[in-house]
Every structure is written in C-alpha cells, then in structure tokens.
C-alpha cells in the first residue's frame, strides 16, 4: 500500500453513517471500527480519506444487510489540502466495499473518487469514472 504524501484530516468517527458508492448491494453503512487504529486512553477511533474501516450494512439488499464488511473511504466532506495549495471537499462521505486483499467487491463506482485513493488503491482508481 502506497503512502499518500499528505496529512488527511480524520473527519469520520465510529458510529458515522456513510453512503456506499458501489454496486455491491449496500446503500448505507455505519462505521464499527478502524483498521490499524491504536488509540490512547479511550480516544474515539477516527478515519479519513483512503482509510480502511469495518462497517455494518444498515440499508441495502436483504443478503447484504446486517453484515460486517471492510470498506475504503473514497470521499469526505471535510476539506483536504494538497501540496499545491488546492483545498478539496466533497458533497458527501462515501465508501467502497473491499475484500481482504483490499480489492473492490463491486464492479462499478458511482460519483467521483479522490486522487489520493486512486494512487493508494489502483483497482479502485481503474473502476472510477471521475478522479478528482
């Protein structure tokens, strides 16, 4: 997994409901835990762009509902600052469901994907229609 090269603000915490931007059958998911997070003294785990989380599917097809799956954050409302000085924010917080090898389970992604995510996860970048 490649490093991002920028410091992304961790704006999504556990318990947050996110939209699922792929065609796996999940529509709304809730963050349960953050992959690789080691906290300090009861600190709430947070995640940002291109981070992996374990999520619970709240709305979707009957075979996907109430399942725990892994997901990668591809959009976040909180603005990020690129080294060029550009500030980028999206309209919503969105994830893509991935498998254990961090490859997407769906076959298409709806909406734009941040360039930082496409660099870290090339398979997600190749499926995206718009990379911002």
Swiss-Prot record:
InterPro entries: Ribosomal_uL14, Ribosomal_uL14_arc, Ribosomal_uL14_CS, Ribosomal_uL14_sf. Transmembrane segments: none annotated. One of its GO terms (molecular function) is structural constituent of ribosome. One of its GO terms (cellular component) is cytosolic large ribosomal subunit. Keywords: Ribonucleoprotein, Ribosomal protein, RNA-binding, rRNA-binding. GO terms for biological process: translation. The keyword Ribonucleoprotein applies. Belongs to the universal ribosomal protein uL14 family. Binds to 23S rRNA. Forms part of two intersubunit bridges in the 70S ribosome. HAMAP family: Ribosomal_uL14. Part of the 50S ribosomal subunit. Forms a cluster with proteins L3 and L24e, part of which may contact the 16S rRNA in 2 intersubunit bridges. This is Large ribosomal subunit protein uL14. It comes from Methanospirillum hungatei JF-1 (strain ATCC 27890 / DSM 864 / NBRC 100397 / JF-1). The lineage of its organism: Archaea, Methanobacteriati, Methanobacteriota, Stenosarchaea group, Methanomicrobia.
